[in-house]
């Protein structure tokens, strides 16, 4: 009968829907297993980092796992282990790769920052349960100086894009909520210098948005502030923003007058 046929069709749809749900659950489980396997490999005494990175890179792009904080936490952990192994070789006076030390530090920082961003998203009850922040903050703070070393190394190799990546990440850490207690914007005396080098690397590539992003962190510094203002003015002129360009020239002139008058004022006291 017609009713019987409709019921039969509905039952088939229900079965099909159940199969799809089971398949989806299976794919999710498989990807989560991949993440755990990647972490397990990285934790071994002699880790196969190529295998661990291959597995985690799949998870970082897979729709089932790419939005999970845990995926990015494991990605950061793998880079941390790569860094530790290189430093272990250095300590034992075995051959080690300096650039690998710097790049693993950079990648670790980026992955942990992304992990924190995802972990700060409220759950279905509107609560934030970020179990990663404390350990990952400590790891980033410990490795942050290597971002300067890596940036300088690439800058000296005239690889401005890579240098900017290092210097830019160093600056972005300073303003990230993860590091509220460290208060880097106020306590980090190297920040203006690194912002200057970030702006310089960006200016060499004519990457004016990056110049305007990083140069302001250096503009009030006594040593490099005037150069930072020149970078800002050049970038604004290149972008055709005449009003802001003229304003930046005036500001740059005022800063240079302040810096010129300060030694004179000290001599007159």
Please annotate each region the language model reported.
Residues 30-34, 104-107, 142-147, 187-197, ...:
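Generic helix N-cap/helix-start motif at coil->alpha-helix transitions
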